[in-house]
């Protein structure tokens, strides 16, 4: 099983429109031989098809394991993505995983969508 290069894993993968659940996930690569520890990075995943935050995490963690990586869910929330208005709002929490650090999530989203207005709040579900 090949070990994934973390740089090849997109930081953000979210649906293009609507309000949907999202999770913030830390992905760990297996340590390279001679390396003191595994490398890691945070990724944001959000999809309309997910009824529960765990649905997203289960799919993503399964995909990452196939690439030789381990994952941990850092929390979740919701994303309101209005592509026509170029606005993304991150808010709320996951009943299963607790709230994600929305500040981290929004920084990653801003990097992918630099011409968008990206905001966050801890309130709401």
Swiss-Prot record:
Keywords: Acetylation, Cytoplasm, Hydrolase, Protein phosphatase
Annotated Gene3D superfamilies: Janus/Ocnus (3.50.20.20)
Residues reported in the UniProt entry to bind substrate: 21, 94-96
Classification of source organism: Eukaryota, Metazoa, Chordata, Craniata, Vertebrata
Entry protein name: 14 kDa phosphohistidine phosphatase
Catalytic activity as recorded in UniProt: N(pros)-phospho-L-histidyl-[protein] + H2O = L-histidyl-[protein] + phosphate; N(tele)-phospho-L-histidyl-[protein] + H2O = L-histidyl-[protein] + phosphate
Any GO molecular function: calcium channel inhibitor activity
Biological process per Gene Ontology, one example term: actin cytoskeleton organization
Tissue and organ distribution: Expressed abundantly in heart and skeletal muscle.
Top-tier EC class: hydrolase
Species annotation: Homo sapiens
Catalytic machinery residues: 53
């Amino acid at each position: 099983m090949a070990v994934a290069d973390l740089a090849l894993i997109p930081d953000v993968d979210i649906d293009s429109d609507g309000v949907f659940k999202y999770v913030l996930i830390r992905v760990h690569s297996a340590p390279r031989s001679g390396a003191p520890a595994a490398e890691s990075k945070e990724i944001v995943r959000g999809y309309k098809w997910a009824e529960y935050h765990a649905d997203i995490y289960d799919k993503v963690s399964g995909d990452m394991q196939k690439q030789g990586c381990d994952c941990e869910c850092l929390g979740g929330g919701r994303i309101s993505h209005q592509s026509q208005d170029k606005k993304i709002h991150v808010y709320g929490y996951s009943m299963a995983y607790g709230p994600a650090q929305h500040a981290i999530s929004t920084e990653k989203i801003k990097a992918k969508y630099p011409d968008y207005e990206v905001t966050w709040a801890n309130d709401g579900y």
